[in-house]
């Protein structure tokens, strides 16, 4: 996963982001360009957490979007819907 993240994130952000993904059990999907959103978070019916981020984003926008979506996951776990 680190080698994949290296293509999309600034070098210094790869390890911390990987730790966030691992800690929160995120299934990360890097998807093709969507006009209406940069990324999204959803809890799947089986209880797993899925974060999608557009592959077309620059490294810094990708980083901000990934952290933003993981924050949605943390808020969901803390406060519920």
Feature-to-residue mapping (PLM):
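Walker B catalytic acidic pair
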Residues: 69
């Amino acid at each position: 996963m680190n080698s994949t993240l290296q293509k999309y994130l600034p070098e210094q952000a790869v390890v911390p982001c990987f730790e966030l993904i691992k800690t929160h059990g995120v299934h990360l999907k890097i998807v093709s360009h969507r006009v209406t959103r940069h990324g999204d978070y959803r809890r799947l019916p089986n209880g797993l957490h899925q974060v999608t981020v557009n592959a077309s984003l620059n490294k810094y926008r990708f980083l901000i979007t990934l952290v933003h979506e993981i924050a949605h996951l943390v808020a969901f776990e803390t406060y519920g819907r």
